[in-house]
Design a protein with these regions (language model features):
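Loop-to-helix junctions at membrane interfaces in multi-pass transport proteins
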Residues: 1-9, 43, 84-98, 129-263
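Helix-loop-helix module between adjacent transmembrane segments
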Residues: 6-112, 180-184, 270-279
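Hydrophobic residues within alpha-helical transmembrane segments
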Residues: 14, 56, 103-106, 125-129, ...
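Membrane-embedded alpha-helical core segments of multi-pass
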Residues: 17-23, 34-35, 111-115, 130-141, ...
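A generic alpha-helix surface/boundary motif
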Residues: 24, 36, 71, 75, ...
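Juxtamembrane loop-helix boundary motifs flanking transmembrane segments in multi-pass membrane proteins
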Residues: 30-38, 45-52, 109, 117, ...
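Re-entrant/interfacial helical elements at transmembrane boundaries that shape
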Residues: 280-287
Length: 287
C-alpha cells in the first residue's frame, strides 16, 4: 500500500549500515572480544543465565522469521506454476503449498548439512550472481512493458491518495518511520545473519569494510522487489489477483517475461530463497 514511500525502509537500512561501517560502533568492540554470537557476549557481560535467555529469544525470533520467508518463497513458486501451466489445484490447495515448502527446505538442508560452511559460501556467491541478473532483467522488461513515466502517472491515478505514493510520513506517520530507522540499526548489530558474518572476519577493519559495502546491497534488495511489486500493481490496474497480493508479482512476471528470461528469474528467486535459509541455518547454529 505504500508504493514508492516503502523505499524509506531500504534507505534507512543504507543509512544505519553505512553509519556502522564508518564508525564501527558496537561491532568492532564485539570483534575485538572474539565472540562468535551475541549470546556469547551476554555471558561475558551479564552471566550464563542472561546468555541462555538471550539465546532463547533469538531462536524464537529466528524460527518465526524463517517460517515467514519459507512460506513466501513457496507462494512465489506456487504462483509461477499456477500462472505458467494453468494448474488450478496448485493455486487452490494449501496442502500443495506445504509440500512445496517441505521440498524447498529439504533441498537447503541437504546441501547445508553435507557441505557445511564451504557450501554456504560458494552457493551464496553463485546465488547472488544469478539473483542480480534476474532482478536486473525483470526491471528492464518492466520499464519496457509499462514505460518509465507511465509507471508514475498510472500509480498516481490508481492510488487513493497521490500524496501517499511518495511520502512515508503521510502514509505511515513519523513514529513508524523513526521506528524503521531504529530497527535497521538494531538488526544490523544483533541479528545473527548480519552479526555472525562480521564476527567471523579476520580483523575489526575488515568488519567496517564489510558494513560499508553491505549498506549498498541493503538498499538495492529493498528497492528492486518493491519496484517490481509496484509494476505488478499497475499492470493489473490495482486489482488483487486471486485475492492474495503475494500472488501478484509471480503472475505479473509470467505475463511480461519471455520464456528464457522467466526461467532465469525463477532460478534467481529460488537462489535468493536458498541463500537466505542456508545462512539462517548456519547463523542460528552458533546460537
Amino acid at each position: 500500500n505504500d508504493f514508492f514511500a516503502a523505499f524509506h525502509i531500504g534507505l534507512f537500512a543504507l543509512v544505519a549500515t553505512l553509519f556502522i561501517g564508518i564508525t564501527g560502533v558496537v561491532v568492532v568492540k564485539l570483534r575485538e572480544l572474539k565472540v562468535k554470537s551475541i549470546p556469547e557476549y551476554y555471558e561475558i557481560r551479564f552471566g550464563k543465565n542472561v546468555r541462555i535467555l538471550g539465546a532463547i529469544l533469538l531462536v524464537i525470533g529466528g524460527i518465526l522469521n524463517m517460517g515467514l520467508f519459507l512460506k513466501v518463497g513457496a507462494i512465489f513458486v506456487q504462483g509461477i506454476l499456477s500462472s505458467t501451466y494453468g494448474i488450478s489445484w496448485v493455486d487452490e490447495s494449501e496442502s500443495i503449498l506445504s509440500i512445496i515448502m517441505t521440498i524447498l527446505l529439504v533441498m537447503v538442508l541437504l546441501y547445508t548439512i553435507l557441505g557445511g560452511m564451504i557450501s554456504v559460501i560458494i552457493t551464496d556467491y553463485i546465488q547472488f550472481v544469478v539473483l542480480s541478473i534476474g532482478l536486473i532483467l525483470s526491471v528492464l522488461f518492466s520499464v519496457h512493458t509499462l514505460g518509465w513515466f507511465n509507471i508514475f502517472n498510472q500509480l498516481e491515478i490508481l492510488a487513493s491518495n497521490p500524496k501517499l505514493v511518495y511520502d512515508p510520513f503521510q502514509s505511515r506517520g513519523g513514529f513508524y518511520v523513526s521506528w524503521q530507522l531504529v530497527l535497521g540499526f538494531v538488526s544490523a548489530i544483533i541479528w545473527p545473519t548480519a552479526i555472525t558474518r562480521a564476527l567471523s572476519l579476520k580483523s575489526p577493519e575488515t568488519v567496517k569494510k564489510q558494513y560499508l559495502w553491505s549498506s549498498i546491497s541493503f538498499l538495492i534488495r529493498f528497492m528492486i522487489p518493491c519496484f517490481l511489486g509496484i509494476c505488478a500493481f499497475i499492470y493489473f490496474n490495482g486489482k488483487v489477483v486471486g485475492g492474495d497480493t503475494l500472488m501478484m508479482m509471480p503472475m505479473y512476471l509470467v505475463e511480461i517475461l519471455p520464456v528464457g528470461v522467466l526461467g532465469i528469474m525463477v532460478a534467481a528467486m529460488l537462489a535468493a530463497f536458498m541463500s537466505t535459509h542456508d545462512s539462517y541455518l548456519l547463523c542460528w547454529s552458533t546460537i
